[in-house]
Amino acid sequence: SIRKGIESLASGKDFENLFESAKSRAIADWLVGMNLSRLYSCLYNQNYSVGRVQTPTLSMIAERDSEITGFIKEPYYVVEIVTDDFSLSTERIDSKEIADQLSNLVPEELIVTEVINKEKITKPEPLFDLTALQRAANRYFGFSAKQTLDYLQSLYEKKLVTYPRTDSRYLTEDMKQTVCEMLDTVGEGFERDAKNIDSIFKNEKVSDHHAILPTLAAMKNGPGTLPSSEKKIYDLIQAKLLMCTSSNLIESTTKVIVEFDGVTFSASGKTVLEEGFFGFVKPFLNNKKNETILPKLSEGDVLSIKGSIVRQKFTQPPKHFTEETLLKAMELAGAEDIEKGIEVERKGLGTPATRAGVIENLIYKGFIERDKKNLLATHKGMSLITIVSEEFRSPKKTAEWEMKLSKIADGKESSKDFLKDIERDISNLVNHYQK
């Protein structure tokens, strides 16, 4: 395959536009970081660091923290009616007076208005790229993104897993035989039961490197003795392969609806019919998948009501970012601002290989801090976001740049024009403060 690759090498000229695009990105990042860091540090007599990726990332954390700080809880009410076997509840009611009136009017018997039975089929998610693995490791084990990357790099150097810094969650078609051999190491006949095996092979979805897998040798011989943290990551990667190729999770869902005095009461139930891939997820969960079993009911059945309760609840603020949710937000940042039909090389803030470093850098520079699993903006971080221009703290700028860089790679836009625009934006900002 190496000889074949050498024989079919493309001309270097074919990649000149791609080179210009990559060079322009590096220069633009340098221009923004060098000029804006010095600008804001001099203006406010603080050691501030500004970057195209790190500042919008900090902005997302700071804005979320501000939303939580400014959130005012509002009470609302639900009326719950109790039968012998289960309870039904209303939707949100804003007035306690109305909720109390409704509760007092509930009769001793109510008729079932509707029963909705459905079969819910859930397919397994794709294989791991680096970001998806970092998110899963943070969710299941509390590992930071950097810790996961370090453990993964160690496993890679021990030849137990494939290349770690990938942004693809699929494999190429020519890997199918190898994957089948991997599955056969789990147990005889497993490969024949791998009903979703074809879903993980998509040539068009593989960029420079395919999804993260255990190596065939590791699957055949076992990973050997590993530090506990590395063992957790290896087991998670192996379980992901088995999960992605296994059958779907099939659940039976039931919704019972009762209408009274123009108000809808409902109860929902769910039971697992076929566990499928979920069997490989369970070992990593603290709690088993909850099942709520409702009695068999039909439209027109009479329910004997034992009582009714008015429950007060409160609206909830958004949750602080964890590394899991921040990585997802970085991956999706600015995606809605990319024009349809344009394929960009990089979407979101950073790359799978750099996002962990961005988070650690923000912590090291004192802009954010860890509070258990949460990531919080510090006073210094909040101060920086308050003073930085909206243009340079918004992920929209990243989307705009990536669209232009994509056009440069396609030969449809000039790198000189792109960099002139960057220089103009920076000059305008500096001139604004000089007035």
Name these PLM-found stretches.
Residues 1-334, 339-367, 372-374, 379-386:
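Toprim catalytic domain recognition across nucleic-acid enzymes
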